[in-house]
Amino acid sequence: MTGTGKTVTRVDLCEAVYQKVGLSRTESSAFVELVLKEITDCLEKGETVKLSSFGSFMVRQKGQRIGRNPKTGTEVPISPRRVMVFKPSAILKQRINGQANGSMSNSDQAETD
């Protein structure tokens, strides 16, 4: 990984909204919290949240399966559960990989179909 290692927090997002949109700090914080709550509420209901040019958050159901304790080797049942997954858009993948817009490889195009 060649990232900077910085973790962006809610406070960082609120500050970015404050700096770039021009809302007060209180309004910026309320705005960020509202957006995050709406995304959370949708996911909790099992809805997919698709953000154009960014990606999709979705909830998937995982069935029961047998796992193994790595220390003892004992089989352990893993209960069925719901997990949240994020699938980045092709545009986000390109930006992360430093590619210019519109220069998708064949493998990237196959993933978006």
Curated annotation (Swiss-Prot):
Say yes or no: keyword Transmembrane present. Answer: no
Alphabetic keyword roster: DNA recombination, DNA-binding, Transcription, Transcription regulation, Translation regulation
- What GO MF terms are annotated? DNA binding; structural constituent of chromatin
Which is a Gene Ontology cellular component entry for this protein? cytosol
As recorded in UniProt, coiled-coil segments are: none
Please name the GO terms of the biological process aspect recorded for this protein, alphabetically: DNA recombination; positive regulation of metabolic process; regulation of DNA-templated transcription; regulation of translation
Would the keyword DNA-binding be found if you checked this record's keyword annotation? yes
Q: Which InterPro entries match?
A: Hist_DNA-bd (IPR000119), Histone-like_DNA-bd_CS (IPR020816), IHF-like_DNA-bd_dom_sf (IPR010992), IHF_alpha (IPR005684)
Q: Which SMART domains match?
A: BHL
What Pfam families is this protein classified in?
Bac_DNA_binding (PF00216)
- What does it do? This protein is one of the two subunits of integration host factor, a specific DNA-binding protein that functions in genetic recombination as well as in transcriptional and translational control.
Give the multimer and partner information: Heterodimer of an alpha and a beta chain.
State the similarity comment. Belongs to the bacterial histone-like protein family.
The entry's protein name is Integration host factor subunit alpha
Q: Which organism is it from?
A: Rhodopseudomonas palustris (strain BisA53)
Q: What is the lineage of its organism?
A: Bacteria, Pseudomonadati, Pseudomonadota, Alphaproteobacteria, Hyphomicrobiales
